[in-house]
């Protein structure tokens, strides 16, 4: 690799910054609360920065970060269980601006989708969030979740069917 090739490769920090919106969405889908999602993002980013040497340049940083975030979420959930705390779903309010009826309707639809996503079992919600929301390939999502591709596919099918039922659409 010559000097020009090295300079054209995005830095770890640059790639990480570009991933922040996607990481935040994934954290929200895992934690079901905006405040917990922020805490989860911060903890996962801290772990990633501390483990930066373990990431191999040229590999998918998004898959690596999703795995770190998921493992951090699992650790947090276990710690809360041990402390006899329970997760209380916080209303994930969305702000609606303007008087436009379509904007108001979009806000209502968004809340319905958020409510339906939060009602899914964790395994289905993770699969749906990674594949349908974040756009990961099935193979990459299966690697992040550390499950066989067939298991991912069945969780997606069940998750989609449950969402369609909850949202009143024909399966």
Predicted regions and their residues:
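A short pre-motif secondary-structure segment
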Residues: 127-131
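Structural recognition of an alpha-helix C-terminal capping motif at a helix-to-coil junction
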Residues: 39-46, 59-71
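Sigma70-family region 2
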Residues: 5, 43-60, 79-80
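Acidic, proline/glycine-rich intrinsically disordered inter-domain spacer in sigma factors
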Residues: 10, 14, 91-118
């Amino acid at each position: 690799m010559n000097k020009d090739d090295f300079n054209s490769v995005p830095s770890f920090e640059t790639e990480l910054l570009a991933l922040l919106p996607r990481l935040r969405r994934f954290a929200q889908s895992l934690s079901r609360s905006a405040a917990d999602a922020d805490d989860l993002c911060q903890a996962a980013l801290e772990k990633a920065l501390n483990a930066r040497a373990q990431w191999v340049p040229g590999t998918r940083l998004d898959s690596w970060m999703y795995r770190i975030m998921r493992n951090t979420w699992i650790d947090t959930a276990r710690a809360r269980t041990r402390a006899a705390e329970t997760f209380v779903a916080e209303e994930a309010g969305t702000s609606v601006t303007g008087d436009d009826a379509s904007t108001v309707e979009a806000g209502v639809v968004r809340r319905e989708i958020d409510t339906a996503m939060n009602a899914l079992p964790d395994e289905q919600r993770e699969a749906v969030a990674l594949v349908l929301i974040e756009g990961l390939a099935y193979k990459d999502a299966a690697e992040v979740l550390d499950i066989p591709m067939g298991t991912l596919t069945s969780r997606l099918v069940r998750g989609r069917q449950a969402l369609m039922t909850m949202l009143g659409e024909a399966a």
